Amino acid sequence: MDMQVEKRHAFEAGGAGALKLLLPVDATARSRWGIQYAKTCRQDGRDVAAALLFVAEQVTSWQVLRFRTQEEIRRFQAERANHLLVDAARPLEQAGVPVQVQYREGDIAFHILDVAEQLECDEIVLPLPHPRWARLISLDIAREVLRRQRSVPVTLVDTLGIPERGCRQ
């Protein structure tokens, strides 16, 4: 199910020459590293527009589905996503960056790449991948997006929003 939760500002408001960034977010602090990158680009005098994206994975666990319907789960995920997106948009709006928010359900890497192409983004901004040992216990979306990358370049940033040397793929 594709659904747009809320549109904060028109993505095109950044102007014709604006650097259009796709910033995927979730409930982790790591996902906010790209917000700092966008703010820094803006502070450096660049015309920037940001699209925040939250992708909810489909819940298929029988332990959850035993107590909740798919519709209840979708509604909960959409409400949670809306809160996260509004919270993530706040610092960008305060920095004068036009923001659009998007909500999708399904495969995370696919939707990141798909939305970036649909919105004609110039960059997808993701946190640096976890160290190899941490990959064993976490879902490493950055590596998966890089592996499946199509036409939109991926910029990997650190905790301060600073792109890693040679990280733009």
Where is each model-derived feature located?
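Short, surface-exposed alpha-helical segments at coil->helix boundaries
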Residues: 74, 78-86, 139, 143
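Hydrophobic structural packing positions in well-ordered secondary structure
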Residues: 21, 38, 112, 125, ...
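Intrinsically disordered or low-complexity boundary/linker segments at protein termini
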Residues: 1-33, 147-169
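Small/aliphatic-rich secondary-structure junction motif
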Residues: 10-68
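General small-molecule cofactor/ligand-binding pocket signal
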Residues: 51-53, 100-104, 155-157
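Structural beta-alpha unit
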Residues: 1-10, 93-124, 161-169
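Acidic, proline/glycine-rich short linear motifs
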Residues: 54-80, 165-169
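Glycine-rich, Arg-bearing micro-motifs that act as flexible, cationic patches
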Residues: 126-147, 163-166
